[in-house]
Amino acid sequence: MKAYTVEQGIVAPLDRANVDTDLIIPKQFLKSIKRTGFGDNLFDELRYLDEGYPGQDNAKRPKNPDFILNQPCYASATVLIARKNFGCGSSREHAPWALNEYGFRTVIAPSFADIFFNNCFKNGMLPVILDEETVDQLFKECAASEDYQLTIDLAAQEVKTPTGEAFKFEIDPFRKHCLLNGLDDIGLTLQNAGAIREFESKAKQSRPWVFQDLKA
């Protein structure tokens, strides 16, 4: 998993509350358990004017010109700001997969659904909770500048605006450690690879029958 230290990027404003996971990535695209192939269908119902289905050539689909991700100034956005209760609905991990593959590493909102919030950390993304007044300010500043950027400093736990104004955010120390060091569940386990091999070696001597191949 890619480490998250300091990220600076263009901000895309999704001025909508209660964005659920079905809106983030519709159910018809959930047949794959791979973590790739979802970016083109992120916010499918909002990005396109027709109904999406797996296997389509998205380049040929009619796009909604009013949706933020179809506007040139937000095409390379890596920071998403949204309203309260972002990621509500079903527990599909495909939602952070789609956001991540599109290019978003940070989502800023006043609140998140718990399962989506947890899934972000497992996929190298940082969900930042800021109060509604601060989020309102970010929306206003973003509307006033087409290339509005934010800098997110995880070590300092700060979101910095182009003027240098900084907003502090809270994060669990363990999750912070994992993001800073690029550790997902597998990476955490591999940190103890030596101890695991030592345990297995001792177990082979004390309980050799456990490691014997079963024969029909």
Curated annotation (Swiss-Prot):
One of its GO terms (molecular function) is 3-isopropylmalate dehydratase activity. It comes from the Bacteria. It catalyses: (2R,3S)-3-isopropylmalate = (2S)-2-isopropylmalate. GO terms for biological process: L-leucine biosynthetic process. Pathway: Amino-acid biosynthesis; L-leucine biosynthesis; L-leucine from 3-methyl-2-oxobutanoate: step 2/4. GO terms for cellular component: 3-isopropylmalate dehydratase complex. SUPFAM superfamilies: LeuD/IlvD-like. Its EC number is 4.2.1.33. Keywords: Amino-acid biosynthesis, Branched-chain amino acid biosynthesis, Leucine biosynthesis, Lyase. Coiled coil: none annotated. Pfam families: Aconitase_C. Catalyzes the isomerization between 2-isopropylmalate and 3-isopropylmalate, via the formation of 2-isopropylmaleate. Belongs to the LeuD family. LeuD type 1 subfamily. Heterodimer of LeuC and LeuD. This is 3-isopropylmalate dehydratase small subunit. It comes from Acinetobacter baylyi (strain ATCC 33305 / BD413 / ADP1). The gene is leuD.
